């Protein structure tokens, strides 16, 4: 609730044109099998296990505290290949909302280049792309009891938004263009939740919002319970907001450049520091 109060200004902002670059798995590939992969997990108590993730998150500005919060919801996955070559990808497990304990695929990101520019982006071979979602439920409650769910086009965007506004909610990534199967699957399990659609602030993202709201209306959701949740100002997506990377295209289109996330994040850190100091002062006085 606090996040929504703080970021209520972000709702229903006007919306740049960006085709999705997610590489979908081949239709003729064999079904996804977790046993085909070697998995390296992030252990919050073991610094050595964390080091391998550094290059995947560094250029995205995603810090260790955010990685700790989401550590159960990502890993490094290396597929067993017949040619003997090995490639580790940052993997975000896809699940079905009705069976959130079974992995049905991966949203994948390759290791970035030395200059930080993007590498491979796609889904693992055989992934259930039509229904599978990355669902990071940080609430400690069953998914069906969630009050607020935030949707994104990528797990990177979800983690970025959390770092800007660290509230333990349900974070969801469609891994590209949202499908009707993904929409109906999650909406059917969470009929009492409010859904915030943090898709990209461009023409495609705006269409994704319209599509999801249409499906939600057909399923009986109240209009105000499914809302757009784009970044304020001239930021295309939530990771750009975290990096304070403004879109020249949005600026050229006349998007009001009235909000600066670097200032917003700095103010939040300063407030936390003040609270910490006040708490320490109180304990010393007692």
Language-model region placement:
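Serine endopeptidase catalytic core focused on the charge-relay Asp
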Residues: 54-64, 88-95
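Phosphate-handling DNA/RNA-contact segment within nucleic-acid enzymes
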Residues: 81-188
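Short, basic/aromatic recognition patches
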Residues: 63-85
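Non-catalytic accessory segments of DNA primases and related replication-initiation nucleases
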Residues: 3-59
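Short, small/acidic-rich helices and loops at N termini and domain boundaries
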Residues: 3-9, 73-76, 246-247
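TOPRIM fold recognition
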Residues: 163-286
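A broad structural signal for alpha-helix termini and local helix breaks/kinks
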Residues: 11, 61-62, 165, 190
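Alpha-helical elements of the RecA-like P-loop NTPase motor core of helicases
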Residues: 55, 159, 210
